[in-house]
């Protein structure tokens, strides 16, 4: 693994997927690309991690999917947030902010 890439911390994948879908529906490759883009290449989500997570999140009713056509005219499954998914995004965002503050405090402790 290149040195500029980091393994996803446990629990962050859901947050990143939900955030990627917050503005618009996307297919799997679009979600992966968006996460890589917004994290400036720090997180690269491989299909073996992404698609099981999408399936699990759809089972939890955080996402719904429908078949459509991708930008290169291929059939693709598009995912979008549900109301429950938006609530989950808020919850996960709040939790991550609390964790970030706590870790920053720990790193600055002498």
Task: Report the location of each language-model feature.
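Intrinsically disordered, low-complexity and often Lys/Arg-enriched segments
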Residues: 1-2
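N-terminal helix-turn-helix DNA-binding core of bacterial DNA-binding proteins
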Residues: 6-51
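Glycine-centered, phosphate/nucleic-acid-interacting loop/turn motifs that mediate DNA/RNA or nucleotide
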Residues: 61
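Short beta-strand "wing" residues that participate in macromolecule-binding interfaces
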Residues: 65
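Conserved catalytic-core motifs of eukaryotic protein kinase domains, centered on the activation segment
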Residues: 69
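Basic, amphipathic "hinge/linker" alpha-helix immediately C-terminal to the N-terminal HTH DNA-binding motif
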Residues: 72-93
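Amphipathic alpha-helical dimerization/coiled-coil segments
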Residues: 87-110
């Amino acid at each position: 693994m290149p040195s500029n890439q980091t393994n996803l911390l446990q629990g962050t994948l859901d947050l990143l997927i939900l955030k990627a879908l917050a503005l618009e529906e996307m297919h799997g490759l679009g979600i992966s690309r968006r996460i890589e883009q917004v994290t400036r290449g720090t997180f690269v989500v491989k299909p073996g991690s992404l698609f099981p997570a999408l399936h699990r999140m759809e089972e939890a009713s955080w996402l719904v999917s429908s078949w459509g056509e991708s930008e290169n005219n291929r059939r693709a499954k598009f995912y979008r947030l549900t109301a429950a998914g938006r609530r989950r995004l808020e919850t996960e965002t709040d939790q991550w902010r609390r964790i970030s503050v706590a870790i920053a405090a720990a790193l600055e402790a002498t």
